[in-house]
């Protein structure tokens, strides 16, 4: 035969409230401790259950003389629930208002991304440089040696474009972190705005492969290619 399951705290609270609602009377704690077992609530737990109801304003208590009396009426619980509902509705209205303000701010931030055009230009420049760099390497395979100074200039130009692109990437990550810290309740709306702006999950810093130096004597050819990029 399986062991009978004990009552949960919420079930005990409901049982003790029934005592008040059915009698609509005032009780001392020791009286409630005697009545509790009749509802399935052991006397040792009655005090804690009653205190939890008092903490939630579902049971009232008052000291009369040297005794403390407890009472609760169905109307008291109804008033308490209505009060909680009004507070929740007020909180919801406040949250909706704040959310609307947040959406407006995010829209303004999205419209204000014109500055990131510099990053777009830097990315375009970087792609062009990488392509020319690849073409240059293919052409220089024909030569035994290359001019280190010219290749160093090429590498520096690529590095400048690379740093510029990643600087704007860092600015975007900083802005995202700021929005997450200040508007955590609007995570989904922010992610939607990021996606619309082209900031997806694979958005990250640009990694630049190493640029090998060569020792070619064909400095004029390499320098001309660098000048063409400018």
Swiss-Prot record:
An example Gene Ontology CC term for this record: nucleolus
Record Pfam families: LZ3wCH, Mnd1
One of the GO BP terms on file: embryo sac development
Any one Gene Ontology molecular-function term assigned to this protein's record: double-stranded DNA binding
Domain of life of the organism encoding this protein: Eukaryota
InterPro entries referenced in this protein's UniProt entry, alphabetically: LZ3wCH, Mnd1, Mnd1_HTH
Disruption phenotype: Female and male sterility due to production of defective gametes.
Keyword match Nucleus: yes
UniProt entry keywords in alphabetical sequence: Coiled coil, DNA recombination, Meiosis, Nucleus
Location in the cell: Nucleus; Nucleus, Nucleolus
Predominant place of localization: nucleus
Entry coiled-coil feature ranges: 79-146
The keyword Transport is assigned to this record: no
Distribution of this protein across tissues and organs: Expressed in reproductive tissues.
Homology family: Belongs to the MND1 family.
PANTHER family: MEIOTIC NUCLEAR DIVISION PROTEIN 1 HOMOLOG
Quaternary assembly: Interacts with HOP2, RAD51, LIM15 and MIP1.
Role description: Required for proper homologous chromosome pairing and efficient cross-over and intragenic recombination during meiosis. Stimulates both DMC1/LIM15- and RAD51-mediated homologous strand assimilation, which is required for the resolution of meiotic double-strand breaks.
Name of the protein this chain belongs to: Meiotic nuclear division protein 1 homolog
């Amino acid at each position: 035969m399986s062991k009978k399951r004990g009552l949960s705290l919420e079930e005990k609270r409901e049982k003790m409230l029934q005592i008040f609602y059915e009698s609509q009377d005032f009780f001392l704690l020791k009286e409630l401790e005697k009545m509790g077992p009749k509802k399935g609530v052991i006397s040792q737990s009655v005090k804690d259950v009653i205190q939890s109801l008092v903490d939630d304003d579902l049971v009232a208590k008052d000291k009369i003389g040297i005794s403390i009396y407890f009472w609760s009426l169905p109307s008291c619980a109804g008033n308490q629930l209505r009060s909680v509902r009004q507070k929740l509705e007020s909180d919801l209205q406040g949250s909706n208002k704040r959310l609307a303000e947040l959406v407006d701010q995010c829209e303004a931030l999205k419209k204000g991304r014109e500055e990131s055009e510099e990053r777009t230009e830097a990315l375009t420049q970087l792609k062009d440089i990488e392509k020319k760099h690849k073409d240059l390497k293919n052409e220089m395979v024909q030569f035994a040696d290359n001019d280190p100074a010219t290749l160093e200039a090429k590498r520096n130009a690529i590095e400048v474009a690379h740093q510029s692109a990643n600087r704007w990437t860092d600015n975007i990550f900083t802005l995202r972190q700021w929005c997450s810290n200040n508007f955590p309740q609007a995570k989904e709306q922010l992610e939607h705005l990021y996606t619309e702006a082209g900031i997806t999950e694979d958005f990250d810093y640009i990694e630049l492969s190493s640029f090998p130096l060569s020792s070619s004597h064909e400095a004029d050819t390499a320098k001309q290619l660098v000048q063409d990029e400018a």
